[in-house]
Amino acid sequence: MMTIAQIMEKMIAFSEGNIHDITHLSCVWTYAKTIGELEGLDADTQFILEVAAITHDIACPLCRKKYGNTNGKYQEQEGAPLVREFLADTGMTAEQIDRVAYLVGHHHSPAQINDRLLSDDGA
């Protein structure tokens, strides 16, 4: 399975050199990683959290081209299927990819995420 560093490298390449996108995903990942560690998440949940943080804005380049903006609604609509394709060759399980896709597809709609915990055990 790809490491977080390898997924980060892949996402940076996917960002087409957009410094804003790269800086933003790096900041979001740093915050998510730190919060997850401080909360004591298990290794799999921490991994999913970090991958979701790295890929949460994966649809931005496509949205800029297709819609002329990166509106959150468009990011959610385009992001979930795009992240599935992006993660297909990482060695992640289907369940892990499903969870990341769910988070990416709802990251501008937190009310829709609140009904579902980050992990099934309540962590």
Predicted regions and their residues:
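General structural signal for alpha-helix termini and helix-helix connectors
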Residues: 13-17, 34-38, 60, 64, ...
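Active-site flanking loop/helix segments enriched in acidic
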Residues: 3-27, 58-69
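Histidine/acidic-rich helix-loop-helix segments that form or flank divalent-metal centers
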Residues: 92-123
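Short, conserved alpha-helical segments within structured domains
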Residues: 24, 45-50, 75, 96-100, ...
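His-Asp-centered metal-binding catalytic motifs of divalent-metal-dependent phosphohydrolases/nucleases
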Residues: 46-71, 79, 101-110
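Alpha-helical phosphate/pyrophosphate-handling elements in metalloenzyme active cores
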Residues: 18-49, 83-90
